[in-house]
Amino acid sequence: MFFKKVACFTDIHFGLKGNSRVHNDDCEAFVIWFIEQAKLHGCETCIFLGDWHHHRSATNVSTMNYTVSNMERLGKAFEKVYVIMGNHDLYYRDKREINSMEYIRNIPNIHIVNEWLVEDDVAIIPWVVQDEWKKIEKMKQKYVFGHFELPYFKMN
């Protein structure tokens, strides 16, 4: 089984407002609250659905320090943490070869999802590039997690 109970969050955008310390402190407070809530509800797995950072080309060292400490916090709290690459995490909008999260790869329990991950009835999909979106409608998985902007697809 891929997971028993999962907690998800998305689009935290560390580094917003010019890498503002106030904003990054608010993000950190949210991560702490999120972990508390997830643990209260018995979640052993976390999926972050993309856009950890706000600026694909201007994330500063202070923001990177917030990233490391909060990813370590998530890694300690959950058995598995899947970190999906969103469009703001990628250097190029139309390809996934360079991202702002690669340096957290060695934090225990953290799994960076920069390519499609499909296992049993679960699919975890990073920012969709080129015409990959066409594959989604044919998927049979019960659970599909991703950072999506799909043409012609209404989401709610």
Regions found by a protein language model. Give the residues of each.
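Short, intrinsically disordered N-terminal pre-domain segments
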Residues: 1-2, 7
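Short, small-residue-rich loop/turn micro-motifs
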Residues: 10-13, 148
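Core catalytic region of metal-dependent phosphoesterases/phosphodiesterases
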Residues: 5, 12, 16-116
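His/acidic metal-ligating clusters that form di-metal
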Residues: 41-42, 120-156
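Short boundary motifs at domain starts and secondary-structure transition points
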Residues: 1, 117-118
